[in-house]
Curated annotation (Swiss-Prot):
Name by which UniProt lists this protein: Amino-acid acetyltransferase, mitochondrial
Enzyme Commission number(s) from the entry: 2.3.1.1
Pathway assignment: Amino-acid biosynthesis; L-arginine biosynthesis; N(2)-acetyl-L-ornithine from L-glutamate: step 1/4
Organism of origin: Scheffersomyces stipitis (strain ATCC 58785 / CBS 6054 / NBRC 10063 / NRRL Y-11545)
Domain of life: Eukaryota
Major subcellular location class: mitochondrion
Localization in the cell: Mitochondrion
Role noted for this protein: N-acetylglutamate synthase involved in arginine biosynthesis.
GO CC annotations on file: mitochondrial matrix
Gene: ARG2
GO terms assigned for molecular function: L-glutamate N-acetyltransferase activity
Gene Ontology annotations of biological process type: L-arginine biosynthetic process; ornithine biosynthetic process
Lineage: Eukaryota, Fungi, Dikarya, Ascomycota, Saccharomycotina
Keyword Acyltransferase: yes
Domain N-acetyltransferase: 401-558
Pfam families, per the entry: NAT
Amino acid sequence: MSKLKNLNREFISNLKSHKLITDAKRNLILSILKSTTTKREARNYLNKYQNQFDFGDLKISSSAKYEQDVSKLTKRDSQRELFVNRYLNKQNPFINIYDDETKLKKIPLRVALFKLKFLNIDPKEWRGIAETFKRLVNLGISPIVFLDYDHLPTDSFKYNELYMINQVNKVMNYLGKPEEEGNLKTTVLRSLFTVENKERGPVINSLESILIPLYQGIIPFIQPIIYNAESTFQQFINSNQLLYSLCESLLDKKDLLSVEKIVMIDPIGGIPSVERNQTSHVFINLSQEYSDIVSELYIGHIEPDQRDLHLANLNTMHEILTLASSKSGNDDTTGIITTPFIMSVNDDLINPIIYNVLTDRPIISSSLPSSNNRTPQLSTSILKKGVDVRSYDADNYARKFTLHNLIEDELVDKNRLVALLDDSFGKNLDTDSYFDRINNSLATLVIVGDYDGAAIITWEYSGTNKIAYLDKFAIAKKNQGLPGLADVIFKIILSSHPHELIWRSRKVNPVNKWYFERCVGSMSSPESQWRIFYTGDIFNRRIDKRRKRIVGSEAVNISDKLVQYSEICEGIPPSFFSSKE
C-alpha cells in the first residue's frame, strides 16, 4: 500500500512539473507573439533563440545509456555543464560531442555586452534594471556587464577602488540574493586584462573566467581594472577600451557564442539629432550616416562636454560594430544606447532593449516624420554597421544626368537593377519601354547595399509645375522585413526631395498602412485603382482649403495641388508586363 502511495505521489509530482514546463513554454511563446508585430519577426526570434530553452519531455529514453546521454546533451544546460567540467580540467569541451556519429547541434551562447555608467542611478531604477536582466535571461540572452567609472579622477587608485567596492556591493544588493529563487545570479570580476606595453591594448588573460559563469547562468560584472605588466601594478583603464578588447576576443569564439547586442547604459541617452530637436536618433545606419552625425555633433547645438561623451559612445559603437561585421561576415550585431531609467522600464513593448531582442529593430520606425506630433520623442538610439548607400542626382554627376549615362559609366548595373525590380514586384519589367520613359526625367537614383534595395525618383510635369514622383521603391524579397532597410531608403528619398514628393500605390497594397504613417495626406477617386500619397515641406505652410479665404503668398492651394497630383499619377503608364513570362 505504501508503495502505491509513493507511486501515486510521484505521478502527481510529474504532472505538476509537466504543467509548470508547459505553462512556462506557453507564457514565453505568448509574450513573444504579443511583442512581435509580424509572423516573420516571431519566426526569426524563435529560430535564433529556441535552443536556449529547455522545454523537453520529462521522460528520457531508457532503451540504452547511449541514448540517454545523447538526449541529455541536446539540452542546453546539460551541454553547458559538460563544457564547464572540461574547461576546469583543461580539456577540449567539444571532443566527442559533435562528431559525425551523433551529429549533435551546438547550442551557442547568445551574448549581450552591457556598459553601465554609474552616475545617479537610484534604487528604484536598479530594481527595474534587475527585472530587465531577468527578462533578458528568460529570453535566451547571456549578459556580460562592464562597470563604467570613467567619470572618476585617475590620480588615486586606492580611493577609486574603495569607492568601486562600495558601489558594487550596493548593486549586488539591488539585484537580489543569488541563493533566493528567482533572483539573479551574479559575480564580480576584476583584473581580467593585461597590458603588456603602451603600443598594445588590453588583452584578456583567461576568457574562461567569463565563459564558465555564463554557462552556469551567472551574469559577470567586470570592473575596469587591468594588470600593467610593465609597472607590475593594477590600474584603471577606459571602459570603452575593455569593451572593444573583450568583444574582439568573443568574436573569435564563433563555435561557442554569438555577440548579439552591444548596449551602453548612459544617463545622457542616445545620440542627439538636430532634426528631432535634440532627442535621439532612432536608428543609425553607420555605413551611411556616421561621418554626417559626427559633423552634426560639432555644429554647436549641445555643450562641448556633452558632445564629447556622445562622440565617445558613437565612436566606440562604430569601431565595435565594424569589427563585429568584419569578423562574423554579417550584420547581426546591434548597438543600443539608452538611459538607466529606460532600461528599468518593465514592458516588452516600451523597453527598447527587450523589444530589440524580440524584433531586432527600434520601438518606432526611424522614417516616421519627426514633425508629426504623433511620433514619439526618444532617448534611445539603435545602431547597425548597416549597408552602403549610393545616391545619384544631377548635383553630384558631371555629365548630363540620364539613366543611360549612369549605366554607360558603370555606376549602375542595368541587369542587376532590372533583376531587383522584377524580384521586388514579382513581375517582369518592360525594360526598354520603362528605361526609355524615365531616361531623361530621372531626378534621383538610390541603390542600397549589393542591390538589396533601390529607389527611382523622376521629375513629372503638370502644366509648368515640376514635381518629384517616387516611381519605384524596391526591396529584394529576401530583405523584405529586414529591420531598418525600408526606413534607410525612405529617409534618403525624403532628404533628396524634402520640398514636395508624391507617389502612388494600388488601393489593395498592404504596404499602404506604412505609407499613411509617412505622408502628409492621400487621395483616391472611386473609379481609380490607385491611392495617391503626398508629403513635403510645402505642407508645413498654411493650406488654402477655401479659395475665398485670403491667405499669404506662400500658402498652398490644396485643391490645385490635388488636381496636379491626380493628373500626374493617373497618367503614368504601367512599367511591368501584365503577367510573369
